[in-house]
Amino acid sequence: MGSSLPFDLILEILQRTPAESLLRFKSTCKKWYELISNDKRFMYKHLDKSTKRFLRIENRERVQILDPVTEILAVSTIPNELRHKYFTLIHCDGLMLGMCYEELGSDPNLAVWNPVMRKIKWIKPSPPLVCYWGSDYLGFGYDKTFRDNYKILRFTYLGDDDDDESYPKCQIYEFNSGSWRSIEAKFDGEIDVEVDGVSVNGSMYWIELQEKKNFILSFDFSKETFNRICDSPLYWDIKRLGCFNGDRLSLLQQNEATREIHVSVTNKLSDEVVSFSRYFSVTLPDIPLFRSIDILPLPGCFIGKNRNIIAWCEQLVGKYDDHTSIILYEIGEGGVTKRIRTGRHEADEDYNDLDNCSYVYVPSLIPVPE
């Protein structure tokens, strides 16, 4: 490769190089091409050392990827076949599972997409599925025995003719077989539809609502079972579930009236007993609301290791609220420590029909499963 550096050192450097740069470098020589394109071990080591970004889809035409540390904003066009309205996007290993409408009134479509590599795979319904529904719940993860054995979970609530109760009917899509199959996994609560689920280390997590308390519900793609892993703290109605430190959950809760925030995190999800503990609070009023408001979509956010919140959101500005600004926030216990405008739009109810302003995303070299 024309270098006097030891290959182990070169590997270490490449594993810490952004995926976007590596894709440009892979034509440098045959060895680098094989490493970046085909070496699964290298791909996953690179992924494990990659840092969180934000992904934003703008006007169905462009995808923006923002590095909140360097504040570098990369913009590229969206492939024509993906220029639709999205109402579900789930991130796992740099891959995005998306459910979208091709046109108003049509059945939704399902796709897996690597935004950096610009690769797409459409997931077709197959028996027992006839079509997808907008009311479907989705999960995205992998069998921990083989990390590249990715699976999709789909479930929806149907009435039981025998006792008229609601229960989820579940199917799994395996890329290895290219088809859906029914499974017997069940749980007896309801998913909180106001809070997006999150994929962490191959398993999917949601907030489950029960009459007296809430729980964190997980789906293990290895065992193909649902499990309640712990109670979910209950303070206020605005809630955001996320991945913390790569192997834990975070829960941001906000009081809409005062804008006060409590952030709780779990211990490692692999521990025998999992529970939340208070991480930090923010009590100042000059911080954004972490929910959608009128034409403003849901902010993207994650919890940092320095007891802070990193968010990319949209806010109305101007004398008559006539335009919006896209703003990167960093919020610590003492309040806002960073506020940078990264873009602007005219305020138009139709200009952006996304439910989310942005999504937490980690660019990767992982190919879209065939």
Curated annotation (Swiss-Prot):
PROSITE patterns listed in its UniProt record: FBOX (PS50181)
Domain of life per record: Eukaryota
Xref: CDD domains: F-box_AtFBW1-like (cd22157)
Location of the F-box domain: 1-47
InterPro entries named among the record's database cross-references: F-box-assoc_dom_typ1, F-box-assoc_interact_dom, F-box-like_dom_sf, F-box_dom, SCF_F-box_component
Cystine bridges: none
NCBIfam families with a match to the protein in the record: F_box_assoc_1 (TIGR01640)
Name of the protein this chain belongs to: Putative F-box protein At3g10430
